[in-house]
Amino acid sequence: MAATASAIRYAPEDPNLPKPWKGLVDSRTGYLYFWNPETNVTQYERPASSAPPKLAAIPVSSSVQTNQQSSSGFNSGKEDDKYGRGSDGPKSDSGSRFNEAGRTGPISSNDAASGLGNASSGGSSARGPPSSAAGNELSPEAYCRKHEITVSGGQVPPPLMSFEATGLPNELLREVYSAGFSAPSPIQAQSWPIAMQNRDIVAIAKTGSGKTLGYLIPGFMHLQRIHNDSRMGPTILVLSPTRELATQIQVEALKFGKSSKISCACLYGGAPKGPQLKEIERGVDIVVATPGRLNDILEMKRISLHQVSYLVLDEADRMLDMGFEPQIRKIVNEVPTKRQTLMYTATWPKEVRKIAADLLVNPAQVNIGNVDELVANKSITQTIEVLAPMEKHSRLEQILRSQEPGSKIIIFCSTKRMCDQLARNLTRTFGAAAIHGDKSQAERDDVLNQFRSGRTPVLVATDVAARGLDVKDIRVVVNYDFPNGVEDYVHRIGRTGRAGATGLAYTFFGDQDAKHASDLIKILEGANQKVPPQVREMATRGGGGMNKFRRWGTPSSGGGGGRGGYGDSGYGGRGESGYGSRGDSGYGGRGDSGGRGSWAPSRDSSGSSGWGRERSRSPERFRGGPPSTSSPPRSFHEAMMMKNR
């Protein structure tokens, strides 16, 4: 009794809680529940509803066992449900007293008082910044309005506006505070209390919102309650669209789970299976994987998912965009139906709604911001510059020179070849490196490590790095080429302005991009950004406008571009020949052969066939061209421009 009571403490005072109710926290499980000292009743449900405004709920799955109570996610108790999926929550190690909502007399007032008193007298308590930094002077309703949080799905607990209110173990709080966090992000504040009730969640939030810790922290608490033998298989499974994101999730899991001795393996394509299989055989608590590689290992029968009771689908929308839905469904079929499932996505199209309805049971839906419209982070200053292709390189150098020395900058290109060329041109003056789908995993890891450390402050990338790349303090994003659509545009610029910081995004826009003008204007206006008159003119003309640039190629001047195969790395960008191949490079996309109105030189029959790369990328190949009447080129990029005149 004493050991159990010592794990209980009072939650921070809540002025909106009706008297005489008290908030209590079980420090071992992290559960927040409520106690009435007059009637000696304890319950998980908040006595007075303070849930934020509700949206339409997700349709209930018919293919998964639906045994959750829609009002709160708890039933009166199914003793045969080990994980508490759809019942009263997981069985706590501290005893059955915390298992049932509304059960009378689970603790006495004396037990509660004595146990809670010990929480404040211990010398190892992790103290963080003052709670006022977390904004807990706001009511839950005001907090939700301020951060544009809306929820749906039955009775949903209010957000936890400070780390002190979460009831996290001291060792975990120390890890969080040492990382420099002063308060939970909005997605964390609202999703943590729901996840700790063992409920399924759909969380819709923009990139850089802190979603990784949004599911990792409740996952750590889940591991403390479920004592599985890790050698028999993982307890937590996280699916990720790209290997970059997968490795970053692993880094975060090991960083914040270090004090709790949590083990994590990462499975992704483009790397040998041997070391990954050895990690699994040693036993791990968490597996982070791309769907393709995990399916390969499942087919080899080298991993078992029968112990997985906490499943996360991170960036679910991008996994579906990449064609991973069959692999996801195959993996989920190997996971027990008695599980907790959390889905995180930046967008909410019908394809994501469908798979959410199939895989989740009576989920709570958490929305940060506007779900129905694609919106950009308002903390990012967006500058659109209408340029001819020959003007882009010199303008890029001006932007780079205008930044403070050592500022981290990402430049996005449409093709892998342009990515390499720009990196070569910029590396001597600015320190640049390229990353794209043709790089080996070792090369990519090395480039990312140099970029993170600041040794190489400029990263030139295709869209393979647009999703999931989580590097702190990125100051500037430059869209050297406009992407395939505004969705990728929003994801690209989302690399900066993360975790409450501000950022800059420069985008070079040309006549070949005019078809995106109307959508781009909506994004800019939605974020209160300036719209250049030339872009408005393009939108009015429906794609015309910059006739003087048409000699460099138009959207109708060439074809050749097609989708490439699917791969663990995500979008590989547009391929050189426009014909992607199956592998880790992802979507091949449109090519340099003119499918995008590129400035790339046309390939005649006397040279290359136009179906693959040229053998040489050096400037020598351009010396045989017609003499130029202008001044000598200052860069390889300008040499290519002059060759095409």
From Swiss-Prot:
Pfam families: DEAD (PF00270), Helicase_C (PF00271), WW (PF00397). Residues 15-49 form the WW domain. Residues 395-539 form the Helicase C-terminal domain. Its EC number is 3.6.4.13. Residues 60-72, 108-136, 598-608, 624-634 have a biased composition (Low complexity). ATP binds at residues 205-212. Keywords: ATP-binding, Helicase, Hydrolase, Nucleotide-binding, RNA-binding. Transmembrane segments: none annotated. Residues 556-597 have a biased composition (Gly residues). It catalyses: ATP + H2O = ADP + phosphate + H(+). A motif (Q motif) lies at residues 161-189. The keyword Nucleotide-binding applies. Residues 77-91, 612-623 have a biased composition (Basic and acidic residues). Residues 1-22, 44-137, 532-645 are annotated as: Disordered. The Q motif is unique to and characteristic of the DEAD box family of RNA helicases and controls ATP binding and hydrolysis. Belongs to the DEAD box helicase family. DDX5/DBP2 subfamily. This is DEAD-box ATP-dependent RNA helicase 46. It comes from Arabidopsis thaliana.
